Amino acid sequence: LMLSTAGQEIIEQNNPLKDIFSKYLFGSLMLWLCSFMSLLVFYLFTSWMPTILKTVGFDLQQLSLMSTLFPFGGVIGAIIMCRFMDRLNPTKVITFSYFSAFLLFILLSFTHNNIALFSILIFMIGGLLAGAQTALFPLATLFYPPSCRGSGVSWMHGISRIGAILGSLLGSLIFTLKLDLSSIFLSLAIPTFIAFLCLALKWYRELNIAKQKFKVVRTD
């Protein structure tokens, strides 16, 4: 930004990181942590699900079905999510998706003996997780102003990649701990709930800020 004062030029350099870590710090942390947890769950589930299911007795046909249903659900979920984001509050839509995925993971831990219900839940979780993750980056572009949008989204992308790498590595820990299938799905519910909580807190904060601005306008 260039300003002129009494014939003198004063140049103020735009500092995107300064804005991110001051005015947009809380929202940034919530978005980054949410994306980190989201990709951690997604890559842990997709990378290790066939191996985990094979160790508990699923046959090859069932493994092929599960491996197909999860990404197919993700494609459908992403399309549906985009439709809802255009019509409703985007933060509200994604928050609801993570909370629904959290509940389905809990339900999944009790229904893995029922192949039909288990398959439906796998499809739905794939849709909710992949759809929410796909919608997170458009949400971030709405959150940041143009002056720091590129930096904010890039930081979010980098941090989420760390979650993806960690998720791919955590499968070996699961085998080391020798967790049963119910415990594995319950453990996946924990980071999913954290992702939901991050967006819920961001949404709550934005509502409070909007209410305060409305009160100021009414007072004026």
What label would you give each PLM region?
Residues L1-G27, K211-D220:
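Intracellular cytosolic loops and amphipathic helices of Major Facilitator Superfamily
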Residues I20-I79:
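Extracytoplasmic gate region of multi-pass secondary transporters
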Residues L53-K54, F84-M85, G171-L179:
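Interfacial helix-cap and linker-helix signal at transmembrane-aqueous boundaries
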Residues A78-N89:
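Helix-to-loop junctions at the C-terminal end of transmembrane segments
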Residues K92-L107:
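Structural signature of the two symmetry-related core transmembrane helices
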Residues G131-Y144:
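Intracellular juxtamembrane helix-capping segments at the cytosolic ends
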Residues F175-P191:
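A membrane-interface helix-boundary motif in multi-pass transporters
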Residues L186-D220:
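Multi-pass alpha-helical transporter architecture, strongest
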